[in-house]
Amino acid sequence: MATSSLTPGVSLDENGSIKLFNKFPFEGVEVKDISLVDYITIGNGQPLPHTAGRFQTKRFRKARCFIVERLTNSLMMNGRNNGKKLLATRIVKHAFEIIALLTDQNPLQVLVDAVAACGPREDSTRIGSAGTVRRQAVDVSPLRRVNQALALITIGAREAAFRNVKSISECLAEEIINAAKGSSNSYAIKKKDELERVAKSNR
């Protein structure tokens, strides 16, 4: 393994390409859901999921942000975790190592499959003024599907780890694996099915 002189500590493989966390290759990862291809960005050749807020300057630019960084940022929710990017990055790294051990697949591909699987395609919104309010089923945009999928995955992992002997890395790994399989053991899949069921009843 050669080491780049430009970026100390970054390992390059035989083809000279950078790996995520110096372990997981970006090559071969694909988005199988055609509607989400433009909204799930698989790496910009960066070894760490950290761009220092580069994608927040304009509306909708976050769609071009690396999907692992978006997952890391979602983990920083709840006031006590705000700004702890290093802690969140470490959690994601350990979760990816667990996913690689349990599935023998590239964790990046498993995450992409999980995000595609647990983003709700249909939701319901409130229509009408204060007097008469009813709910109407609406289609969900691809960007919101990705946003909701990431939020549901991280909320599920956080709730599973609360008052549990398992670490949050283990819970996050389990949540991502179950979501990628479409298993009902996943919090994100359960919530997605619930949202779609409510929307179907309000068509």
Swiss-Prot record:
The keyword Ribosomal protein applies. GO terms for biological process: cytoplasmic translation; ribosomal small subunit assembly; translation. It comes from the Eukaryota. Coiled coil: none annotated. SUPFAM superfamilies: Ribosomal protein S7. GO terms for molecular function: mRNA binding; rRNA binding; structural constituent of ribosome. There are 2 genes for uS7 in S.pombe. Component of the small ribosomal subunit (SSU). Mature yeast ribosomes consist of a small (40S) and a large (60S) subunit. The 40S small subunit contains 1 molecule of ribosomal RNA (18S rRNA) and at least 33 different proteins. The large 60S subunit contains 3 rRNA molecules (25S, 5.8S and 5S rRNA) and at least 46 different proteins. Belongs to the universal ribosomal protein uS7 family. This is Small ribosomal subunit protein uS7A. It comes from Schizosaccharomyces pombe (strain 972 / ATCC 24843) (Fission yeast). The gene is rps5.
